[in-house]
Amino acid sequence: MALTKAEVEYVAMLARLELSEADLERYTTQLNAILDYAQRLQGLDTKDVPPTAHVFPLHNVMRDDRIDPSMERERIVANAPEEEDGFFRVPRIV
């Protein structure tokens, strides 16, 4: 299945992308190469290959949950243009 330049242009329009003629040519070529590769992968015999989600076995790789000391409030607000009672003072928006 090959994409036409018109189809790539249509998808670009849906995505609100403004593409030059050179971009259209390049993306059409690149997308067709990707689709060709996917088509070749479809032809592979995978009946003896077990389904996998990851190449490497990952099991809940997380860091230890710990509380680290943070910076003192005085040091944090020291660089603020305006400060009031230890809090940043910002212009009213509403």
UniProtKB/Swiss-Prot annotation:
InterPro entries: Asp/Glu-ADT_sf_sub_c (IPR036113), GatC (IPR003837). Its EC number is 6.3.5.-. One of its GO terms (molecular function) is glutaminyl-tRNA synthase (glutamine-hydrolyzing) activity. Heterotrimer of A, B and C subunits. It is an enzyme of class 6 (ligase). The keyword Protein biosynthesis applies. SUPFAM superfamilies: Glu-tRNAGln amidotransferase C subunit. Keywords: ATP-binding, Ligase, Nucleotide-binding, Protein biosynthesis. This is Aspartyl/glutamyl-tRNA(Asn/Gln) amidotransferase subunit C. It catalyses: L-glutamyl-tRNA(Gln) + L-glutamine + ATP + H2O = L-glutaminyl-tRNA(Gln) + L-glutamate + ADP + phosphate + H(+); L-aspartyl-tRNA(Asn) + L-glutamine + ATP + H2O = L-asparaginyl-tRNA(Asn) + L-glutamate + ADP + phosphate + 2 H(+). One of its GO terms (biological process) is regulation of translational fidelity.
